[in-house]
């Protein structure tokens, strides 16, 4: 039986934290998130926070986006962003550098919903098939997205029809990700 998106995300998150601990002998550290409240924070010291992913008590659906654009969003999208709190995590997918976007706090969730709504409105104006971003790449014009119609994970060139399928499903994509720790 294939893994659920939630389980695949939890597995990747665990691999990321273990890779960080192996390299730095601590939980992951982030300097940019100092002063921003989150259930992920284990410790704040000097100008950095030590953090770890925290599963939500109950998965959520991002219905504000659906209501705002009057579009049902793919279940994998809800599962990906609704399962846990975490800082963004760096990884490689088949040699490509990616930064997996995550929700740090409920306030961060509101920001994501606004950004996603803007992204979907732009796609609607350009008459593009809707995609839902989940990661960024080294190229600011390319993002990793879920195709809202098929559920495939794609390399999506922003504002164009140029798309390349990377994985048949979100769970498959997450299982193939390799954590990258600086």
From Swiss-Prot:
GO cellular component, one term: cytoplasmic side of plasma membrane
Mode of membrane association: Peripheral membrane protein
Location within or outside the cell: Cell inner membrane
Keyword line: Cell inner membrane, Cell membrane, Membrane
Pfam families: Syd
Major localization listed first in the record, in broad terms: membrane
UniProt-listed NCBIfam families: PRK04968.1
Family named by the database record: Belongs to the Syd family.
Its biological purpose: Interacts with the SecY protein in vivo. May bind preferentially to an uncomplexed state of SecY, thus functioning either as a chelating agent for excess SecY in the cell or as a regulatory factor that negatively controls the translocase function.
Protein name stated in the entry: Protein Syd
Native source species: Aliivibrio salmonicida (strain LFI1238)
